[in-house]
Regions:
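Catalytic-core helical/loop segments in enzymes performing group transfer/polymerization on anionic/lipid-linked
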Residues: 1-444
């Protein structure tokens, strides 16, 4: 009737050989001769072959290999290219690990629309609600999220009464190509459950890691390779355009002094002594009277996005040269030492093996790697540079791909920053241009 094979046709083909398909059908393995007794119909032959295959038995390892390696075709979510199953499993595992570390239901206070969009990326997997700073904490939440140290005391007291953890979010140490004050999206943020890394008045997740964590030799080797890649690619926090500068001729010691935004929370909570750029310059000149002092003001101040510090306009009278433009990474190859209050530039200089003097208490001070003018009683441990790097760049931050929106590793973040910096510069959006203009007007 055209729907089933005739009996004569079945019997005529009873003695054909049966083969098994392996490796997705690319090769064939002979099983044996078909028996007339099993020839019930052509439609049953595939099932008979399957039963024959399964009677042969297989180890668990062979089964796993066949299902996950032989039968799967995997695509790297970052590079959009074929990859090994181990690469995909590692990427999926990273998403699950980071999402497991964060509360399920969060309410965030005081985030601008631009930061709200980025917070959704860095807390992917959590349910997020947003509130103005003066609003109350709603019911049915597991945690409160704030930006840095900007939370109102009333909000912190309300969270404490309800025993809700407060997560403090801040920029990571490998952030972007361009300034955050220009609304450039970050590759890295940190989410701290205790404090925040620049606040030396109390512990943070990073300080606890540095004080207690034990790193294996393999982890230290990974940190060393990461550090070498950073130096090789000249990666810094903002990765601004570099301008050539050469140290003056002669044997005079060249010292770089880093300016900061004086209203920054890192000075308020991390500099118990000196707190102004002018005071820092005066102290460094007194400490190094014979050195050639180079002063670099903060890029946000140079761009007009933040106010200059009190008396900072007199910096030229306290140093030998002021360098307002360009990336700091180019200067690292030309100097002998660097002095900071709490600037991240000191950490970047440590990565390059430079002598670093801290007049405040940045997160990298107090571990035996810097020359410190202040002391923190909680920091008693001596660390290697690679241990510091593993904690600060691998354990502590979160990295999110600008392309895929997935959580990524520090190594993958460096790849993205290198490609981002090499790409043609993009024009500012209308929102970015208006924000910059408004910032300049506000600070007049």
């Amino acid at each position: 009737n055209g729907k089933t094979a005739s009996t004569d046709h079945v019997r005529a083909n009873m003695h054909q050989r049966i083969y098994l398909s392996t490796s997705g059908g690319s090769t064939w393995t002979q099983v044996g001769e078909a028996s007339p007794d099993c020839a019930v119909g052509a439609a049953e032959r595939p099932f008979a072959a399957a039963r024959a295959r399964r009677r042969q038995g297989a180890s668990l390892e062979a089964l796993v290999h066949a299902v996950l390696v032989g039968a799967c075709r995997c695509i790297d979510p970052q590079r959009h290219q074929p990859c090994r199953i181990e690469t995909l499993m590692g990427a999926i595992g990273l998403q699950r690990r980071l999402q497991a570390q964060q509360p399920r239901r969060c309410v965030a206070f005081g985030f601008t629309p631009w930061k709200q969009r980025n917070l959704r990326r860095f807390l992917a997997g959590s349910q997020l609600r947003f509130r103005a700073p003066w609003r109350r904490i709603p019911q049915g939440v597991d945690a409160v999220v704030v930006w840095g140290r900007r939370a109102k005391p009333r909000l912190l007291e309300a969270a404490a009464r309800r025993q809700l953890p407060v997560l403090q979010v801040e920029d990571g140490f490998l952030r972007s190509v361009g300034l955050g004050a220009d609304l450039v999206d970050p590759v890295s943020w940190v989410v701290d459950h205790q404090g925040v890394y620049y606040d030396a008045t109390r512990p943070s997740d990073l300080e606890t890691l540095l004080a207690t964590q034990q790193w294996t030799s393999a982890q230290c080797q990974r940190a060393a390779a990461l550090r070498q890649r950073l130096v090789q690619e000249a990666i810094t926090k903002y990765n601004l355009q570099a301008e050539p500068w050469s140290r003056p001729a002669g044997q005079r010691r060249v010292v770089l002094v880093i300016g900061q935004v004086e209203s920054d929370a890192s000075i308020r909570y991390g500099a118990p002594g000196l707190r102004t750029n002018r005071a820092l310059l005066e102290a460094v000149r007194a400490a190094e009277p014979q050195a050639y002092l180079v002063y670099k003001p903060h890029p946000d101040v140079v761009a007009g996005l933040c106010r200059a510090g009190a008396g900072e306009d007199a910096a030229a009278q306290l140093c030998d040269e002021v360098l307002p433009q360009g990336s700091i990474q180019q200067l690292f190859t030309q100097i002998d030492a660097l002095h900071v209050l709490t600037s991240l530039a000191g950490f970047e200089a440590l990565l390059r093996g430079l002598e670093v003097h801290c007049w405040g208490l940045p997160f990298y001070a107090g571990w035996g790697l810097t020359h410190d003018r202040e002391r923190c009683g909680r920091r008693q441990r001596q660390l290697s540079l690679d241990e510091l790097v593993h904690a600060a760049l691998i354990d502590y931050p979160r990295y999110v791909s600008r392309d895929s929106g997935w959580f990524i590793t520090a190594e993958q973040a460096i790849e993205e920053l290198v490609a981002w910096r090499a790409a043609p510069p993009q024009r500012r959006t209308l929102v970015q241009a208006l924000f910059r203009h408004w910032g300049r007007l506000r600070r007049r």
